[in-house]
Amino acid sequence: MAKISLIQREFKRQRLVLKYEKKRTFLKREIQRTPFLKQKLQFHRILQQLPRNSASVRLHNRCLVTGRSRGYYRDFGLSRHVLREMAHQGFLPGVIKSSW
């Protein structure tokens, strides 16, 4: 189980990304569209004043159950350990143990 503080920090980042998503995409689009250097610099300055954690690049995928960041399966939102246990218990419909 990951530390509670790490899980909460990641949750805070997710909220910030959602809060500033429209503003950030608008500013990036305007930087690309504007042919004038002064306006580009002005938009860039506004973009830099946004919180760092509002950038989607700073998000990490974490397991919904344990908060583990490594061995994460995007399709399920779970780490490999939890995925294996839940599959064995039958909590994931359609997931079967492979054999050939």
UniProtKB/Swiss-Prot annotation:
It is found in: Plastid, Chloroplast. One of its GO terms (molecular function) is rRNA binding. One of its GO terms (biological process) is translation. GO terms for cellular component: chloroplast; small ribosomal subunit. Gene3D superfamilies: 1.10.287.1480. InterPro entries: Ribosomal_uS14 (IPR001209), Ribosomal_uS14_bac/plastid (IPR023036), Ribosomal_uS14_CS (IPR018271). Keywords: Chloroplast, Plastid, Ribonucleoprotein, Ribosomal protein, RNA-binding, rRNA-binding. Part of the 30S ribosomal subunit. Belongs to the universal ribosomal protein uS14 family. Binds 16S rRNA, required for the assembly of 30S particles. This is Small ribosomal subunit protein uS14c.
